[in-house]
Amino acid sequence: VLNLAELDRGPEAAAQFRESLRAATHDVGFFYLTGHGVPADLEGRLLAAARAFFALPEASKLAIENTKSAQFRGYTRVGGERTQGEIDWREQIDVGPERPVITDPAAADFWRLEGPNLWPEDLPELQSVLAEWHELLSGIALRLLGAWAESLGAPADAFAPAFAPDPSTLIKVV
């Protein structure tokens, strides 16, 4: 368990956080982050919007099926994905940051994943709460990435060319 707020509690606490982060990522491979500042009301609104989305009629969800998105965004029905050949028994919606489609044929293939999301017409609050979630969590991720770089002996902005200022993220609501 790592407390991100330790970065704000002085040089010694920040150094200890970075060392704990390095150990967790190097020796364990995962960690649970606390002290991130995500408001409980935002978590609640996100969970409520997710429940409301999955309670929509099938036709409403299929109207934004990810097969209609060149960026693989939108709804995936139960059994619509497989892992190692086995059906994944879940439904989900995938969203990313709202950005223009990259049309440059010389751009790397991964840039084709940038673009618009598909949103359900009958649940507009899903878009606003996920945009708020994305904005907040992207900032937390960039802060954590800077601490991780420092934990490895690099400058805090070592990963910035790859991830900042606008990280390419994917939110999967399951």
Where are these regions (language model features)?
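Peripheral, non-catalytic segments flanking oxidoreductase cores
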Residues: 1-174
